[in-house]
Amino acid sequence: NLINFMEMIRYTIP
């Protein structure tokens, strides 16, 4: 899903 991908990136840039 789109949200899933965005969420992953958000966690990758803490």
From Swiss-Prot:
What Gene Ontology terms describe where this protein resides (cellular component)?
extracellular region
Q: Report a single Gene Ontology molecular function.
A: phospholipase A2 activity
Needed cofactors, names only, are: Ca(2+)
Top EC group? hydrolase
Expression across tissues is: Expressed by the venom gland.
| Cofactor comment | Binds 1 Ca(2+) ion.
EC number annotated for this UniProt entry = 3.1.1.4
Main site of residence? secreted
Main role? Snake venom phospholipase A2 (PLA2) that inhibits neuromuscular transmission by blocking acetylcholine release from the nerve termini and exhibits indirect hemolytic activity against human erythrocytes. PLA2 catalyzes the calcium-dependent hydrolysis of the 2-acyl groups in 3-sn-phosphoglycerides.
Report the family membership: Belongs to the phospholipase A2 family. Group I subfamily.
> What is the protein's given name?
Basic phospholipase A2 T2 A chain
Organism, per UniProt?
Answer: Bungarus candidus
